[in-house]
Amino acid sequence: MTALSRFPRFFVTSPSPCPYLPGRQERKIFTELSGQQAGELNDALSRIGFRRSQSVAYRPSCAGCTACVSVRVVTEGFQPNATQRKLLKRYGDLEVTACKPWATGEQYELLKRYLDSRHPGGGMAAMDESDYADMVEQSPVSSYVIEYREPSVNGERGRLVGACITDQQGDGLSMIYSYFVTDDEARPGMGNFIIMDHILRARAAGLPYVYLGYWVKGSARMAYKTRYRPIEVLGPTGWALLEDEDMVGAMPSAVAAALA
């Protein structure tokens, strides 16, 4: 077996405008996930801050910036606060199903409404149904679409009010992308509920973590991620509990050196 077949090859994207910090440029390092070891590689890379998108694992590698910090919730210690308990009770009627990674028109229509409401003009705004199918189905790892529906009536499935593309990893669940109704006053806080549902289900399955992707201090779009405690951040010496949000996260030095 050659070295190239044993170890993944990494590539770096060209700089592009940062979607989180105005005036900044982002750059990503990435590798392909393929073959029988794709799941094992994805698990290992997630532990050093990579995320999956279809058959690619990537992480920020921006010149002079380490603002994007990987975060994961420690499921065993999670205790919902009063507001979160009310939300869990409010949505106790929903029917939750872990579906195979097969895109449906109903899912796509919900995604489009979500994007039009929350992220108009964003990078996914022009996504068509074929693009969505690729997003869901081109997964070389253990992946699901977790659907959240209103109660069934007379044998008919209830309305789809939320969904999340989720990977099952060796040490937890990784929430790849969630979307939900945003224009129903009877369903506020749906995104928060989906995160808590993942935390509780992961804990029940004996999985220690729920990976939430990247957190950027000072970004309003990212602020919600630190509501779920205890939460760990990936810093220079590895994963550590986030106790002071003024702390500065950075890529572990060994990883930075290897990817330079």
UniProtKB/Swiss-Prot annotation:
It is an enzyme of class 2 (transferase). GO terms for molecular function: arginyl-tRNA--protein transferase activity; leucyl-tRNA--protein transferase activity. The keyword Acyltransferase applies. Its main location: cytoplasm. Its EC number is 2.3.2.29. GO terms for biological process: ubiquitin-dependent protein catabolic process via the N-end rule pathway. GO terms for cellular component: cytoplasm. It is found in: Cytoplasm. It comes from the Bacteria. Belongs to the R-transferase family. Bpt subfamily. This is Aspartate/glutamate leucyltransferase. It comes from Sphingomonas elodea.
